[in-house]
Amino acid sequence: MKKPLLLTLLCMILAGCDNPKSLESFTPEMASFSNEFDFDPLRGPVKDFSQTLMSENGEVAKQVTGTLSQEGCFDTLELHDLENNTGLALVLDANYYRDAQTLEKKVQLQGKCQLAALPSAGVTWETDDNGFVVSATGKEMKVEYRYDSEGYPVGKTTINSQNRLSVTAKPSANPRKKLDYTAVSRVDDRQVGNVTQSCEYDAYANPVDCRLVIVDESVKPAVSHHYTIKNRIDYY
């Protein structure tokens, strides 16, 4: 058998041998919203998605769903945190996100569709020259956000009158596996927790299935919590 034909057959048999799509950076809106609303950022022409966090007992702990325009703006965003019995549902309307049920104006926007202010809580967001949210300032606290060269969120620091909480994430060196990461949480100079995540990816280098381990080091002995994350993503 000729070598080129053999390689062709091997490519047909082996998973991942088809041509991968070129990597796209994370948009300012996707990266910033993922920071504020606590979900894994996605890249590429995402049309709609859902992320479901499940405990090791198979119970849904949290779910995030969203729809995006072809320009990358969030048309809708819905979050349900079952562990803490909280949630919200937002729908885009010109320069605001409204509550999907009451239609009350909730979030004020800037630029194309970036976060600007949450008037009811007295929170304002500031962006850098590239449009990424780099800080959120409220009445009694300030949050500073950090990103890498591809726009991936790599940490945040929350400062209030009592302490300083920092989270620092280190993603995989493999550019196609950004959501494989380790993170460390500190209160002032004391480490209080760590997180490890590993995922399987689609052709856009977005996570499909992930395993998440959260270790609470603020108690002795430390307590580990194991989760799985199921992602459904549709593209344009």
UniProtKB/Swiss-Prot annotation:
Primary location class: membrane
Lipid-binding residues (covalent, N-palmitoyl cysteine): 17
Lipidation (S-diacylglycerol cysteine): 17
Protein location: Cell membrane
Keywords, sorted A to Z: Cell membrane, Lipoprotein, Membrane, Palmitate, Signal
KW Cell membrane (keyword) present: yes
Topology relative to the membrane: Lipid-anchor
GO cellular component: plasma membrane
Protein name (database record): UPF0257 lipoprotein YnfC
